Every structure is written in C-alpha cells, then in structure tokens.
C-alpha cells in the first residue's frame, strides 16, 4: 500500500508537449493494433489467436505489449466477451456469432504508454446490444465535450453518467480510469 501511494505522489500528472507526443505515438500504435484486429474478429476463432496477432503486430512496429507481465498478467490483450466488464484473459474458447468483445490494448513505446479499448461485434448482434453500443458511444462524445478549461475529470464522468442514466443504463463504478505516462 505504501509503495503504491509513494508511486502515485511521484507521478507527473501534468505532461510536457514532448511527453504528450510520445504518449500519442504509443496510443497510435494501440489504435493501429485494434484496427488490424477488427478484420480478424469472426466466429470460429479464439481470443488467444487475437492476442498472438496483437503481440506480433506491436513488436513488429517497435513497441512492447504494455500489459504482458504487468502485475503478472499473462497476455498482451485484455479481452472481455459479452457482459464481462474488464480484464478478461485470452483463451482457447471459440468466439461465436452474436457476441461482443471488449478488447483493451496497451503499448509501451519510446518509454511511454498508450492504452485504450474498443468493443467489437462478432457478426450480427441483437438490436438491444447495438442500442447499448450506440448509447455508450454517444456518452463518450458527451464526456469529451466536458474537456475544457476549468473543468475537472469529475465533470467528464458526471456528464457520461447522467447521459447513460437518462437512457436507462448505468455505469461501472469500479476499475475505471488511470493516468498515462511512463508507468
């Protein structure tokens, strides 16, 4: 516990423009990795296959998988099918038509991390799932609108929560949010 608190107080919360550019380069590799995976996601494959593709792609582009070995995590990606919230471990279970896969990817490149997630559909999915995906996508844009001078991260979260609740959905309150940088 004390080590974690010590780490938090030693983190630089405000980044220089040079640091932001290095984080951007890592994040761009994350985006390219997720984009590459999009064409590979289909019924009949397993998530371990996607994980292996991602690791090779990241390394081929001079990055290091950001999650692999972090807190003993055994894989490159966190892949959470259907209603699993986060941090799913890739395995040999076969992906089926109608599922959704939340894929979280992190990359370390040039000493800085990039990290984001995207939810993919596997073939045709139920109308209710498509509605959920559209509402969560719109809530992202509602949150982005709150990133302005004088606002705090809590203002962003508040806007997202209010939007989702106005549409009959809630928000996950655990395992959400972290900084980016060298750690």
What are these regions (language model features)?
Residues 2-183:
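Active-site neighborhoods and metal-handling regions in enzymes and metal-associated proteins
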């Amino acid at each position: 516990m004390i080590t974690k608190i010590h780490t938090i107080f030693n983190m630089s919360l405000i980044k220089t423009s040079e640091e932001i550019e290095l984080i951007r380069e890592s994040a761009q590799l994350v985006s390219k990795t997720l984009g590459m995976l999009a064409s590979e996601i289909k019924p009949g494959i397993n998530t371990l296959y996607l994980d292996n593709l991602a690791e090779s792609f990241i390394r081929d582009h001079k990055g290091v998988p950001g999650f692999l070995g972090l807190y003993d995590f055994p894989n490159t990606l966190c892949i959470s099918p259907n209603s699993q919230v986060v941090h799913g471990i890739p395995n040999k279970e076969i992906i089926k038509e109608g599922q959704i896969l939340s894929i979280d990817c992190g990359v370390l490149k040039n000493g800085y991390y990039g990290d984001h997630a995207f939810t993919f559909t596997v073939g045709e999915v139920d109308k209710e799932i498509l509605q959920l995906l559209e509402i969560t996508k719109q809530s992202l844009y509602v949150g982005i609108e709150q990133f302005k001078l004088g606002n705090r991260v809590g203002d962003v979260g508040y806007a997202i929560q209010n939007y989702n609740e106005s549409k009959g959905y809630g928000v996950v309150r655990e395992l959400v949010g972290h900084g980016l940088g060298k750690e």
